[in-house]
């Protein structure tokens, strides 16, 4: 059927979305009134949305449905819970056994179908809601720190060496030039033997 109005289809209701009422997320268009968490129906925006495949969630419901399972996960400090989210209508699915991929570019393939990459620091899965990209890899926000001093980094303030990331200060101290006049500040020469 031709799309005479020229608008895109909403990712939730599949009706035409016109420019004045459009919200875009991960290449999909939504009506402002349809841009709601699929579980709790809370209004979403660019800072609160978490995407899994074609589905949109608030970060809380996303964490309950797809985050780590077990005592103490996703609740904040000092709480333990066995709530698996059934009260919110979340049904847990058994995951099928692992099948090795035959795709030579598995990470890009996994991104397109909603899979996840592994954080180089902790080796855990990195989901879109917690992803930071630096040195060509995906990291958890909490793991995106200098390997030497632990200082939080941004993609513009890091230096990488051998797959590890450092703040510019630690990188300069550990891997920068050494010898006469280096690393002492303006006007100072030091002779070390």
UniProtKB/Swiss-Prot annotation:
Indicate which residues form the motif Nuclear localization signal: 64-69
Q: Which Gene3D superfamilies does UniProt cross-reference here?
A: Cysteine Rich Protein
Functional note: Could play a role in neuronal development.
Q: Which InterPro entries match?
A: Znf_LIM
Q: Does the keyword Phosphoprotein apply?
A: yes
Instruction: Write down what this protein is called.
Output: Cysteine and glycine-rich protein 1
Q: Where is this cross-link: Glycyl lysine isopeptide (Lys-Gly) (interchain with G-Cter in SUMO2)?
A: 91
Task: Please tell me whether the keyword Ubl conjugation is annotated for this protein.
Answer: yes
Q: Where in the cell is it found?
A: Nucleus
Species in which this protein is naturally found: Pongo abelii (Sumatran orangutan)
- Any single GO BP term: sarcomere organization
> Modified residue N6-acetyllysine is at which positions?
84, 112, 131, 137, 161
Q: Gene encoding this chain? A: CSRP1
- UniProt cross-references to PANTHER family, sorted A to Z: CYSTEINE AND GLYCINE-RICH PROTEIN 1 (PTHR24215:SF23), RHO-GTPASE-ACTIVATING PROTEIN LRG1 (PTHR24215)
Single GO molecular function: structural constituent of muscle
Stretch forming the signal peptide: none
Q: Which domain of life is it from?
A: Eukaryota
Q: Which UniProt keywords apply?
A: Acetylation, Isopeptide bond, LIM domain, Metal-binding, Nucleus, Phosphoprotein, Repeat, Ubl conjugation, Zinc
GO annotations of cellular component type: nucleus; Z disc
LIM zinc-binding domain residues: 10-61, 119-170
- How does the annotation summarize its subunit structure? Interacts with ASCC1; ASCC2 and TRIP4.
Q: Which residues carry this modification: Phosphoserine?
A: 81, 192
